[in-house]
Curated annotation (Swiss-Prot):
Complex formation: Part of the 50S ribosomal subunit. Contacts protein L20.
Family assignment from sequence similarity: Belongs to the bacterial ribosomal protein bL21 family.
Organism the protein comes from: Stenotrophomonas maltophilia (strain R551-3)
GO biological process, one term: translation
NCBIfam families: L21
Origin superkingdom: Bacteria
Protein name as annotated: Large ribosomal subunit protein bL21
Function: This protein binds to 23S rRNA in the presence of protein L20.
GO cellular component terms, semicolon-separated: cytoplasm; ribonucleoprotein complex; ribosome
Length: 105
């Protein structure tokens, strides 16, 4: 069984046992979190699609909090002896999917 969930303004296709990095959530490491905003549920019988399926939920365990690798940004103006360097490290929460509960549309 798999599901498409929405968190942090992004959509993720998940299955039980998967590990993934999502936008940072203010939760403790080791805690259990529940996602209710599920757009799609799929299994061998077919799929259920809807805007926030009622009764559907995905549970996950928080594995770690961290920061991604640095992304380097360089702005350069030719022939003007001008260059601007900047860097960014995005915060993330790493989770493991522990369960997918189905619901009705």
């Amino acid at each position: 069984m798999y599901a498409v969930l929405v968190t942090g303004g992004k959509q993720y296709r998940v299955a039980q046992g998967e590990k993934l990095r999502i936008e940072k959530l203010e939760v403790e490491v080791g805690s259990e979190i529940k996602f209710d905003n599920i757009l799609l549920l799929g299994d061998s019988d077919g799929i259920k699609i809807g805007d926030a399926l009622s009764g559907a939920a995905v549970t996950a365990t928080v594995l770690s909090q961290g920061r991604a690798d640095k992304v380097r940004i360089i702005k350069f103006r030719r022939r003007k002896h001008h260059m601007k360097r900047q860097g960014h490290r995005q915060y993330y929460t790493e989770i493991e999917i522990t369960g997918i509960a189905g619901g009705s549309k």
